[in-house]
Amino acid sequence: MWRRAEESRRHELVGIVRDVAEARFPYPSVAAPHYRTHVNLPTPEMGLTVAGGGVRALYPDILVVQYPGNHPAMVVQVESKETVTREQAERVWAPLQTADAPLYVYVPAGHLASARDYARAAGIKGVRFRTWRRQPGGVIVQEF
């Protein structure tokens, strides 16, 4: 089976993450001046500190924080068709769950059922799924 190069996939994902951040998390804004959006692709900007097996920082694709204080408000992970997998749910989505902020996982249109199954198998509860579809000039997001 043909699989695109990792560099190509990563380049596309960086653009999709940027488009999702601009469209769905345009903070700070007049309506929400106390929020700040940090995009961690291609370079980590703001981490989420988690405990468990030692304190460590995780870098979701998008992290929205309340300012001042940088308290997590929304944790967002954006996936490509290659990364909607059981391993991704276990190794990436599950650790991003926090009691402090909801976890949003954006998956390509057509991959929602698989993503839900993987999240359930990984014991992830309360995840909020969205689908994305590339369109000329940006990304269209659908909420579920």
State each model region's role.
Residues 123-140, 144:
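Charged, structured surface patches that assemble and position nucleic-acid processing machinery
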Residues 1-18, 22-74, 136-137, 143:
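Active-site metal-binding core of divalent-cation-utilizing nuclease and nuclease-like domains
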